[in-house]
Amino acid sequence: MLQFILRRLGLVIPTFIGITLLTFAFVHMIPGDPVMIMAGERGISPERHAQLLAELGLDKPMWQQYLHYIWGVMHGDLGISMKSRIPVWEEFVPRFQATLELGVCAMIFATAVGIPVGVLAAVKRGSIFDHTAVGLALTGYSMPIFWWGMMLIMLVSVHWNLTPVSGRVSDMVFLDDSNPLTGFMLIDTAIWGEDGNFIDAVAHMILPAIVLGTIPLAVIVRMTRSSMLEVLGEDYIRTARAKGLTRMRVIIVHALRNAMLPVVTVIGLQVGTLLAGAILTETIFSWPGLGRWLIDALQRRDYPVVQGGVLLVATMIILVNLLVDLLYGVVNPRIRHKK
């Protein structure tokens, strides 16, 4: 087991270095002068322009800027935002909490709906329900997030007036932003908020969670169905049926438990999909998370924010994938003993 862990950790280091290099190169390839963007319509004198370039370290050769960036990362310094002059880490934390809360709710929705639908589709293979589930899963997987979000807003929020259009809570909800309990709005409003605040936070969460969870839901349905069909054809399932076990016991205890191994892996790998989808979802619903933060930073060429934000997001994806690999090695010894 130790060798398995060391092999996985050995892959993390070069991946991390590659991410820093690609992120740095990508950010500096974006056209536009960050100093001129900061100045806006006011303009700036050549002397002041050169002074700001020197203060931001942008007057140095690329390799020196990269080494300075790596040195800061190794010491936990991701830089300071060019716009707000606030350390990137301090800007990252509250936005990460907002995105994490949205991502967890989206994954709960996708898992709670996807696994039962996938199991039922496999059990009723060839039925109308099976064909409908597969068709909807394919549609959900290929559906543009932006279009799907706008359609739900028009139908549910505007036409039916059932949920709010944007934000995490309504303007009338008061919470002490300077001293949040957890940073997660659902928890804070449940513990600290006044009557109705929690319901308001839940109402704001519904549509973004559905939109963000649609693609993972489609993937989970397809993987659960495929894995269940494979397991239901195994000899030990036929043996369990021959022993007179009830159909429900065979499906839940014997089939589903073994079919969940690839499903768990897929769920873990959906973290990247959630973070990518969060960029569009947060833009549509004005959700103050990582997606909107990075998009705003890209538009104003805020190099430290983009580099630090992408690096932190990539690190989270790497750690989650590493955790999934380790858990899969625990539940499936053949994987960890494989050379």
Swiss-Prot record:
Part of the ABC transporter DppABCDF involved in dipeptide transport. Responsible for the translocation of the substrate across the membrane. InterPro entries: BPD_transp_1_N (IPR045621), MetI-like (IPR000515), MetI-like_sf (IPR035906). It comes from Escherichia coli (strain K12). It comes from the Bacteria. GO terms for cellular component: ATP-binding cassette (ABC) transporter complex, substrate-binding subunit-containing; membrane; plasma membrane. Disruption phenotype: Inactivation of the gene abolishes use of heme as an iron source. GO terms for biological process: dipeptide transport; heme transmembrane transport; protein transport. It is found in: Cell inner membrane. The complex is composed of two ATP-binding proteins (DppD and DppF), two transmembrane proteins (DppB and DppC) and a solute-binding protein (DppA). MppA can replace DppA as binding protein for heme and ALA transport. Belongs to the binding-protein-dependent transport system permease family. OppBC subfamily. This is Dipeptide transport system permease protein DppB. Residues 96-328 form the ABC transmembrane type-1 domain. Keywords: Cell inner membrane, Cell membrane, Membrane, Peptide transport, Protein transport, Transmembrane, Transmembrane helix, Transport.
